[in-house]
């Protein structure tokens, strides 16, 4: 059965160290007068029945940003900012729905139909009831890029992910490879543009 909105909990990943931005909290940097995280929440919330924010710093600030959407703050249970899989694990453990939709806090243009398209792909015969659906894009030159932190995942994967992390593994694609994963191609690569530096943020502000 194709998952619908009420079966999906959204997870905005805002738990990183922002090293390429000089260590600032990336989701709290402003674009057009609002934090990047606020832009993402506005696009993510309508696609989900419940909402979580993975934040390892400034939880009170993120709680205030998430309050209009009824969002709950979750934090990594592993020390040392081990990467997006730790945020995913916190989300999988906390969600009370069958599916979790993840997106990073630095992608203010994420598609309004992200959940619907990933859910449709998980339910296809070819996907054979996939465990994970994730995103690829194709640029004007025909080059394909994978965007693994945009994903729809079954929350039953939590124990397997915990074991993977306990073994010292950290790579998102390596964990996906353990499961039935389907890739969904989006033609608008700009929707998945993520901001990695203050210069990129400034450029987007002027665009």
Where are these regions (language model features)?
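Nucleotide and nucleotide-moiety/phosphate-recognizing core
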Residues: 2-169, 174-193, 198-203
């Amino acid at each position: 059965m194709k998952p619908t909105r009420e079966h999906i909990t959204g997870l905005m990943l805002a738990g990183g160290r922002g090293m390429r931005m000089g260590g600032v909290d990336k989701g709290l940097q402003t674009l057009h007068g609002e934090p990047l995280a606020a832009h993402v929440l506005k696009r993510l919330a309508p696609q989900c029945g419940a909402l979580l924010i993975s934040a390892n710093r400034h939880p009170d600030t993120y709680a205030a940003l998430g309050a209009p959407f009824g969002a709950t703050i979750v934090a990594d249970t592993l020390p040392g900012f081990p990467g997006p899989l730790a945020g995913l694990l916190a989300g999988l453990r906390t969600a009370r729905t069958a599916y979790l939709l993840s997106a990073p806090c630095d992608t203010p243009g994420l598609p309004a139909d992200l959940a619907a398209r990933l859910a449709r792909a998980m339910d296809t015969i070819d996907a054979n009831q996939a465990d994970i659906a994730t995103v690829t894009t194709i640029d004007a030159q025909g080059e394909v890029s994978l965007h693994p932190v945009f994903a729809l995942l079954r929350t039953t994967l939590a124990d397997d992910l915990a074991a993977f992390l306990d073994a010292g593994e950290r790579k998102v694609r390596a964990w996906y490879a353990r499961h039935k994963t389907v890739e969904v191609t989006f033609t608008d690569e700009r929707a998945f543009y993520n901001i990695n530096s203050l210069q990129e943020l400034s450029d987007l502000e002027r665009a």
